Every structure is written in C-alpha cells, then in structure tokens.
Amino acid sequence: MEGEDGLGSPSLYRFTAEHADLLAAKGCIWDEGYRDTREQPVISLGFKGITFLELRAHGARADLHSKWGAIVPNPAWRLVQALATITSPKGVITIDGFSSHLAPISAEDAEVLKTIELDEAGLKREFRISGWVRSMKGPALVKEHIFGPTCTICGIQTGHTDAGAKTVLPSTAMARLDFRLVPDLTHEIVVNLLREHLDRRGFKDIEIVELGNAPLAKSSAKSIVARAVIESAHEVYGISPLVYPMDPASGPVGAVCGVSAPPTPVASFGISYAGSNPHGPDENIRVDDFLQSIKFIGRIIYQLGAAITETNSVKTAELKLERAAVQSRS
C-alpha cells in the first residue's frame, strides 16, 4: 500500500530508482480502472504522465484597501493575464513550442483507438454538462481524451473569498495547474517551455513552483499481461472490454514500470464504475463489482500461468530444433 499518490509519490520514486533490478518483470498489473456507463470494463495499457505546479504573482507587502487599486499593481489581475496566454479560448495549449514535442500516434495505437466508442450522451448526463470542449465528438473526442495533453487550472487563490463583501486589493495570487503528459512530453520540457513562454511575454515576475510530477507509462496490447487481462475480462464479464492504449489519468506507474530496461508492460483495471466519483466527497464502489473483481483476478492469474507455460514450451521446442539442426550438420 502506497499512500503518497496525491503528493506525487516522492518516496516511491526514490525506492524504485535505487532498486530497479528488483522490478524487472514480464508484466505489471495496476489497479486503476472502472466499468463505464454501459457497464463495459475499461482496461488501460499505460497512463499519462503529470506535471503539477503553482504560478504565483506578488504585489504589496500585505493586502490593501481597494481604494489603492488605481495606482497599486494587482497580482490577481497579473496572474489572470499570464494564465490567459497559456491556452486559447477554445482550450488549445498555446505555450510556445509545446506542440512540437508531441509524438505521432503509432499504427498499433491508431488501430486500438478505432475500437473505442465513448458513451457521450451517458457521460454528459453523469457530469451534467451540455457539451464537450471544442464541440468534439466521435473518433476525434476519443483521440483527444486518450492522447491529448492537458493544462488544467485546479484552483485559484487570492484576496477575500469568504462570504460577504470586503474591499481588498490582494497582495498575492496563486494558481495550481496540472499538465497531463503524452508520449515525448516530459516534466522538464513543460516547465522549461512554460518559463520561456512567460518570460517572452513580460511575465518574468510570475513565479513557478514545482509541486510534483510523474512520467507516463506505455505498453503494447501484444504483451503477455495485456493478453491475459483482456481475455479474462471477456470470460468473467461476458462482454468485450474497452482497451485504452493509455489511461487519461496519471500515477506512479512509470516509477515502477519504467526503471528497468526494457520497461515492464502494464495492464490496469479496477473495481469502480461510472458513478464512483473518484477523489470526490462521495467516492464509492458497488459490492457486486468488488465480488466480480475477485473472480477477475483469479482468472488473470490462471491466464498468466497458461501464457507463460505456452511461451516456455515454444522456446523449448525451438531450442530442440536448433540442436537437431546443429547435429545434422555435424
């Protein structure tokens, strides 16, 4: 059990970096997943990375009466103006040079994307929203959801935010942002590009404070662990699972699966459902999903054993053929 996920898992990263030799494996099973609005189990073969940071603007030594607003700089406005340069009104990230660091989608991933269909109407009902960003739909929506980088304002804090009126000119303003990272985009690239982007626009005074990060994890649907999990889902749930090449969420998966060479393949699933509301005040799971997941795990263990036995048998047969060929030549 690792309890620092929300903090960026700093202790886990230190441990895995020091003990990479202990983590080499044929596959990794991760515990992130759910059943969607149509009750299809969702299996992910990786996770986006993440960069979490703060932008801070500073003004007077302390909050002032707002009568000074005509002549004293307001850090809240300063921060808002800086934030407005980071994305377009349509939600496209506009940081200089950002798009040039996004890897093209591989042929294998493009084929997997074709099999995914989001329950757009059901999700909109669940979230109580009227539409998606940039009015996307269909394959474009799926592609953006899984392979699109993000820049999310997670919170803004400045001035007087309690109930009632108070005429305040804030002394500080802070925004917390997270960036979800896709292939070829790293924490270091994002921080450096953001710093340069703000500096070019006259925002050298905006402070960037790095709070945490995690690299992405990415593997193939052809791996032994992926095949075992997908086949087991068919058998246990009686329905074809949705297979995501990469989960839109993030976590310390890269710290575990990315430290060995080659990286360890990962397949992830979970016991939540569309209404679980992870990280919300009413986060929950259903008892039936919990019980069915026990059967799912049992079937995966069986499938992994069968797959590895088959692989070893093939290797043994190939070795016998090689030896026979050598003997015949001699």
What are these regions (language model features)?
Residues 37-38, 93-172, 180-193, 201, ...:
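An extended, acidic, His-containing surface patch that forms the Zn2+-binding/catalytic region
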Residues 3-7, 42-43, 70-71, 220, ...:
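Alpha-helix capping and helix-loop boundary segments enriched in small/acidic/polar residues
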Residues 64-72, 163-166:
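A short glycine-threonine-serine/GTX helix/turn-capping micro-motif
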Residues 42-58, 266-273:
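Flexible glycine/proline-rich, aromatic-decorated loop/lid segments
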Residues 1-8, 53-57, 68-89, 177, ...:
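Alpha-helical metal-binding/catalytic segments enriched in His/Glu/Asp
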Residues 1-46, 309, 323:
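Acidic/histidine-rich catalytic neighborhood of metal-dependent amide-processing enzymes
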Residues 22-26, 49-52, 262-265:
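Short coil/turn connectors at secondary-structure junctions
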Residues 1-8, 31-35, 59-61, 247-249, ...:
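Acidic, glycine-rich active-site loops and adjacent beta-strand->loop/helix elements
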